[in-house]
Amino acid sequence: MEELIAKRYATALSSVSKDVKSIASVLNVLSEAISVPEVHEALTSPIVSAEKKTDMILSAIGKEADATMVNFIKILGENKRLDLIPAIAKVLNADLQKESNQYEGVLKSSSELGKEELAKLEKTLETYTGSKIELKQEKTDLEGLRVSVDDLGIEVNFSKQRVKEQLIDFIKKSL
């Protein structure tokens, strides 16, 4: 439900704004600020008035902010939707990635890959999808590799355990 509402706000914002990239970057910064527990608590608190919440966000973006951005924040405040800023930022980022045909993905593994190996993997994914994909590495206790690009709906998993199981099944079937 939240994503549907955020999508409508993001569509409206991108239709009236000339520079969607700068607005998306401001919303990304606001999203990080909202992820701080104290700020999130203030935004979702029924005790704090909607005007104070709006003023808090407006003071965070500063006086030199774009008029479109200021009006957008005021509309979100009037409709008590300031807590949707992270979701709106996510939708705008996804739209910008789709527009530029560049996506971000996550590579999860127990050990870090070298820059050359990572570049090869990115090149392979680019050939497969036709889109430029930039992978960020995350270290996990997973034995193997997991590559996911959420905006494209891609998830590839290579685990030692799964390969072992498939090899055993293949040997059993061949006997």
UniProtKB/Swiss-Prot annotation:
InterPro entries reported in the protein's UniProt record: ATP_synth_OSCP/delta_N_sf, ATPase_OSCP/dsu
Bilayer topology annotation: Peripheral membrane protein
Example GO molecular function: proton-transporting ATP synthase activity, rotational mechanism
Cellular component terms (Gene Ontology): plasma membrane; proton-transporting ATP synthase complex
This protein's UniProt keywords: ATP synthesis, Cell inner membrane, Cell membrane, CF(1), Hydrogen ion transport, Ion transport, Membrane, Transport
Chief location category: membrane
Record's subcellular location: Cell inner membrane
Subunit structure of this chain's protein: F-type ATPases have 2 components, F(1) - the catalytic core - and F(0) - the membrane proton channel. F(1) has five subunits: alpha(3), beta(3), gamma(1), delta(1), epsilon(1). F(0) has three main subunits: a(1), b(2) and c(10-14). The alpha and beta chains form an alternating ring which encloses part of the gamma chain. F(1) is attached to F(0) by a central stalk formed by the gamma and epsilon chains, while a peripheral stalk is formed by the delta and b chains.
Main function: F(1)F(0) ATP synthase produces ATP from ADP in the presence of a proton or sodium gradient. F-type ATPases consist of two structural domains, F(1) containing the extramembraneous catalytic core and F(0) containing the membrane proton channel, linked together by a central stalk and a peripheral stalk. During catalysis, ATP synthesis in the catalytic domain of F(1) is coupled via a rotary mechanism of the central stalk subunits to proton translocation.
Protein name: ATP synthase subunit delta
Gene name linked to the record: atpH
